[in-house]
């Protein structure tokens, strides 16, 4: 019987960033699934639009103000999100704390404006198919926003209270990847809800 060769892995890191992390692959898989859900919802919007003589049926598209403000807030949130991810990769606790708190402030601002946005859609979810699909798109995105906001809040608290280890920094990095998905998912929704009815009636 031959002896098995072994490799001493005791000095290898117990965590990793990017594609070397199992959590990164899980996040990418979740983004792929949820991105498909967003795509299906947008396809449903255009399917229903194709069945309607007038779109929106009331003739009044949603007001641009709050949707546009939210677009600016989301794009701006990419800055602290990027720096939080870079600080996490270098395990710079002070910078991670700063940028995570900044992400929370912008995430909260987005939610406040989103609440106002729902009031200026010029339709209600029970009014007709148009109202239902517009509310569904916004509710779908809002759900993702709220869940990632909660995740960001929990991670921020943990960065102040501990326990702190390398894996916690990986969590911050993966959270940043997911936030980019939330930002990217908003852009086609904004185009669909706010610009299509105005420029492609």
Regions found by a protein language model. Name each.
Residues 1-201:
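...captures the hydrophobic TM-helix bundle architecture rather than a specific catalytic motif
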């Amino acid at each position: 019987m031959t002896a098995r060769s072994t490799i001493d892995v005791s000095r290898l890191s117990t965590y990793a960033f990017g594609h070397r992390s199992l959590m990164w692959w899980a996040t990418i898989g979740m983004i792929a699934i949820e991105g498909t859900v967003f795509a299906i919802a947008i396809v449903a919007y255009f399917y229903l639009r194709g069945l309607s003589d007038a779109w929106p049926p009331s003739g009044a598209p949603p007001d641009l103000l709050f949707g546009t403000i939210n677009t600016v807030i989301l794009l701006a949130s990419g800055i602290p999100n990027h720096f939080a991810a870079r600080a996490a990769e270098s395990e710079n606790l002070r910078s991670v704390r700063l940028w995570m708190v900044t992400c929370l402030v912008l995430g909260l601002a987005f939610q406040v404006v989103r609440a106002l946005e729902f009031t200026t859609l010029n339709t209600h979810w029970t009014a007709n198919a148009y109202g239902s699909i517009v509310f569904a798109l916004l509710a779908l995105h809002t759900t993702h926003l709220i869940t990632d906001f909660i995740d960001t809040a929990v991670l921020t608290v943990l960065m102040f209270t501990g326990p702190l280890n390398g894996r916690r920094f990986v969590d911050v990095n993966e959270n940043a990847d997911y936030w980019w998905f939330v930002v990217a998912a908003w852009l086609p929704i904004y185009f669909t809800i706010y610009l299509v009815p105005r420029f492609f009636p």
